[in-house]
Amino acid sequence: MFDPVDTYMNTLVPMVVEQTSRGERAYDIFSRLLKERIIFINGPIHDGMSHLIVAQLLHLEAENPNKEISIYINSPGGVVTSGLSIYDTMQYIKPKCSTLVIGQAASMGSVLLAGGEKGMRFSLPNSRIMVHQPSGGYQGQASDIMIHAAETQKLKDRLYDIYVKHTGQTKKAVEKALDRDNFMSPEEAKEWGHIDEIVESRSKGDDAE
């Protein structure tokens, strides 16, 4: 069984040391970036990841409800309900969430990318975006399989509605696009309404001082 905590603890995470008025303080790199209101969604999306991302979003809202949150995405997708918990929290909190795909935003990762604030959804030039309909496998009694199939259909319709809301496409166009695995370049994703801009470098106004 997949253990996200074990995976995290056995992955080398760089530490950074910061000088403060009280001396030195060490952070793991992701905690240090969280101080700058940067959240990473990296790897498969599952319950272990989603509750950490949701907690970070709520923490940053409590810290400053008026300051933007930046979400960097490199994910092949994962569990639909886990992804929707992150998506719903992004929509729920007061701070605007900008999204940037680095590498790939596939399946549920693409939903989170599209769910960023309009005008603040970005892609690096060599990233890939993939959309498709949800899938699942079930076993057991025929009646239970039918129940799960009906629930999958409801989730599919809900995801279609989310894409319609954030891309500006019609329901029919979304259904056609998601019928099979549909890979898009950043240029294609921008034309489809999935992202707003393709960025190759930081603007001068974004340079660290």
Swiss-Prot record:
Name used for this protein in its record: ATP-dependent Clp protease proteolytic subunit
InterPro entries in the cross-refs: ClpP, ClpP/crotonase-like_dom_sf, ClpP/TepA, ClpP_His_AS, ClpP_Ser_AS
EC identifiers of the protein: 3.4.21.92
Organism listed in the record: Ruegeria pomeroyi (strain ATCC 700808 / DSM 15171 / DSS-3) (Silicibacter pomeroyi)
Family that this chain belongs to: Belongs to the peptidase S14 family.
Keyword annotations of the record: Cytoplasm, Hydrolase, Protease, Serine protease
A Pfam family reported for this protein in Swiss-Prot or TrEMBL: CLP_protease
Gene it is expressed from: clpP
Reaction catalysed by this enzyme: Hydrolysis of proteins to small peptides in the presence of ATP and magnesium. alpha-casein is the usual test substrate. In the absence of ATP, only oligopeptides shorter than five residues are hydrolyzed (such as succinyl-Leu-Tyr-|-NHMec, and Leu-Tyr-Leu-|-Tyr-Trp, in which cleavage of the -Tyr-|-Leu- and -Tyr-|-Trp bonds also occurs)
Higher taxonomy: Bacteria, Pseudomonadati, Pseudomonadota, Alphaproteobacteria, Rhodobacterales
Record-level GO cellular component terms: cytoplasm; endopeptidase Clp complex
